[in-house]
Amino acid sequence: MALNGIQIFKLTPKKNCKECGCPTCMAFSMKVAQGAMQIEQCPHMSDEALASLSEATAPPMKTIKIGTGDAEFTLGGETVLFRHEKTFVSKPRYAVSLCTCMDDAEVDAKLAAIPHVDYDRIGERMHVELVYVNCSADADAAKYTALVEKAKGLGRTLVLGCTDPEIAKAALEVCKDGKPVLNGANASNYEAMNAVATEAGVVLGVSGKDLNELYDTVAALEKLGNKNLVLDTTGADIKETFANTVMVRRAALKDQDRTFGYPSIVNLVKLAKGDHHLQAALASVFTMKYGSIIVMEQMTYAEALPLFGLRQNVYTDPQKPMKVEPGIYPLNGADENSLVVTTVDFALTYFVVSGELERSGVPLNLVINDAGGLSVLTSWAAGKFSSTSISEYIKTEVEPKVKCRKLVIPGKVAVLKGDLEAKLPGWEIIVGPREAVQLVKFLKDMQA
């Protein structure tokens, strides 16, 4: 059961030293109880108090790390069932599935296709992060290890779908340094699989024929000292899988049952084998409803664009606007004599506009104003993107650095042109297009 602020306060040193950033120990205790701060941020907390508080104040869902280096990812650590209650913290990761039942040509084709989906959206890299390597019932250790080694060459974090401890041990010998997930523990083999995963130092995936068996198996693994787990909630059909995934998350977060407080794997290949359209639809469902690792047969651009866009929208903090730093961004080799274009600091606006400006090839200085992370029309309506804010920023930040006196403003705020001309004497105010897609033609026409 989570502690409240008063219970935490009783164990604090009560110095009111402010070194944690809070004015009093009571304020610090309240923030710890709300999950806004960690108990370790108090520099004067005794070891005994830390030991008693750390477990009680930890998130009900454990944070699990997989992979290494650039391919390291964090799963779990969630504290709320719904994004609007606070925020989601660990986005789901998508995996493309390989299997020993495939021939070499099919495996090679899949491995060659995975790197093709790799692009940036609003400053975030969108790519297939994981490869799920499944061991079919008729495969031996040599065949499975060869497939794992081939998949490892792609440089993505691996998830090993294998229930045979000896085969799993052999496969881990070639990939354990990359910190993969070993997804294969169940009620009949969990002791042996636990030994293999613990020896290799990797995360262990656990499954069960139903939630009761899954719960008992996880509890048994915890008794063995292993809390580095993920739960495979894939059931016999879509309905059961959805129910399993939601009930596991609700048990952990609402009922505070830490036995189910682990990230989830959802294997869509088992639910809709060969139906790529249905898999994409289900991936969107489990992106919103609690899948931590989502396994699919493929990830093409047609599937990636909506899925990654959905994931990015759901897994942003609703309490913080998506914004970029205000400043001057030279594009296409711009210098002090290059044209000045201005817009707001809303991240989506910035990346769309800057992308079109770069595509034009015209050297220019993109000036980003502090508009509170709002879009052009919203910030204008709120008074955050006004002739006053723009002119003051131009005078203080731009005029000392840029000699060009031509300023392009968004077409949607053309009404600001007159005021800006009055407040920025010596500047030529040019009304740009209303849509970013029109910028390339607009800039080329200006140069003509």
Task: List each language-model region with its residue ranges.
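Terminal amphipathic helices with adjacent charged low-complexity linkers/tails
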Residues: 44-49, 176-177
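Alpha-helix initiation and N-capping motif
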Residues: 5, 22-26, 417
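N-terminal amphipathic alpha-helix/helix-capping segment at the start of soluble metabolic enzymes
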Residues: 2-14, 47-111, 328-333
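Conserved mixed alpha/beta catalytic, RNA-binding, or beta-rich assembly cores of soluble enzyme
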Residues: 34, 82, 92-412, 418-420, ...
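Local cysteine-cluster metal-coordination motifs and their immediate loop/turn environment
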Residues: 13-31, 40-44
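Glycine-rich beta-alpha loop elements in corrinoid/cobalamin-binding modules
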Residues: 423
